[in-house]
Amino acid sequence: MSFEPKNFKATEPKALPVILMLDGSSSMSSNGKIESLNKAVDTMIQKFAEEPRKDMTILVSIIIFGGKGAHVYMEYTPVQKLVAEGFVPLRAAGRTPMGAALTLAKEMIEDKNRTPSRAYRPAVILVSDGEPNDRWEEPMQAFMEGHSAKCQRFAMPIGDEANRSKAIRQFLGEEYIENLYYADEAKDIADAFSRITMSISERVCSRDPNVIAMTRAAAPAAISQQVPKPKVELMPDDLAEEF
């Protein structure tokens, strides 16, 4: 049987989804926090777009919680497209409905039309400068069940109030507590986000991106005082092909 190029279908790159759950409440508008966060997100996208692998595509989605609720600010978008079109900066206003953001993130992860099971294990990043002011406990419990429970999780509390947040620490749990990157103030956001970007990039460059590289977060002080040391944690065999 002769080879027919028209019948040949190239394998599509496998996706590594990255979901950013970002605090867009009014408190983020003070002291340059939202501006610093916008720059950090844009830099993360630029760095992801530089990754050389052709058999993988990094998809970034943004969920913002602020105003009167939470909404999907940006559906999954390939980083190359984001670089070409430009990242639209976030604005800050309103309250801190983190529970609503968790619900949206779970819906996105559980929906196979949006997050296919063939994709690599998603990375979910939670950023906030305070405690949630909605009913977050049930959405948090729901997030820790099903497909969403298998995600790699990071958190970046900004300031003392967020660093004491029960919700942020519950989001990480014991499994990912070392993925807490504390930003004392706006100027520390870029450094914290850079460390998270580096951790995800390590997965991209690894032989098996479903092997999660854990990193030791900096202590709740100036982030630059401590450099994280990598620690490797293997996924269970039954999760190796799909998350």
Regions found by a protein language model. Name each.
Residues 11-74, 81-121, 123-127, 154-169, 187-192:
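Von Willebrand factor
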Residues 159, 208-243:
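Extended acidic, low-complexity intrinsically disordered regions
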Residues 18-25, 82-89, 175-176:
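A short small-residue
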Residues 35, 130-174, 183:
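VWA/integrin I-like adhesion module and closely mimicked acidic/polar interface patches used
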Residues 160-213, 217:
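Von Willebrand factor A/integrin I-like adhesion domains
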Residues 2, 7-11, 49-54, 110-119, ...:
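Surface-exposed acidic, glycine-flexible loop patches that form ligand/cofactor-binding
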Residues 41-49, 103-112, 138-143:
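Short, well-ordered amphipathic alpha-helices
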